[in-house]
Amino acid sequence: MKMSALFVIFGLALLFCNSFAAELKATGRGCGGLMDGCDGKSTFCCSGFNCSPTWKWCVYARPGRR
């Protein structure tokens, strides 16, 4: 019983990873979304996000934010 539960959990995790990789490959975005790493030189944030100079990841663009 324990072994079959482990197989189910492992199978679901494998399915999730496979679908995530397929979607990432299909979209092929060249820009970063929320909390994606950026440096402002070679990697950039998508529209609506700014690269945080402190944390080096994309954050929501807000009025008054540098």
Swiss-Prot record:
One Pfam family per UniProt: Toxin_12
Organism for this UniProt entry: Chilobrachys guangxiensis (Chinese earth tiger tarantula)
UniProt signal peptide: 1-21
InterPro entries (alphabetical): Huwentoxin-1, Huwentoxin_CS1
One GO CC annotation: extracellular region
Subcellular locations according to the entry: Secreted
Modification sites for Proline amide: 63
PROSITE patterns documented for this protein: HWTX_1
Signal among keywords: yes
Species lineage: Eukaryota, Metazoa, Ecdysozoa, Arthropoda, Chelicerata
Family: Belongs to the neurotoxin 10 (Hwtx-1) family. 46 (Jztx-7/10/12) subfamily.
Maturation propeptide residues: 22-29
UniProt key word Signal: yes
Protein name as annotated: U1-theraphotoxin-Cg1d 1
Cystine connections: 31-46, 38-51, 45-58
Keywords: Amidation, Disulfide bond, Ion channel impairing toxin, Knottin, Secreted, Signal, Toxin
Tissues with expression: Expressed by the venom gland.
GO molecular function: ion channel inhibitor activity; toxin activity
Record remark on domains: The presence of a 'disulfide through disulfide knot' structurally defines this protein as a knottin.
Role noted for this protein: Probable ion channel inhibitor.
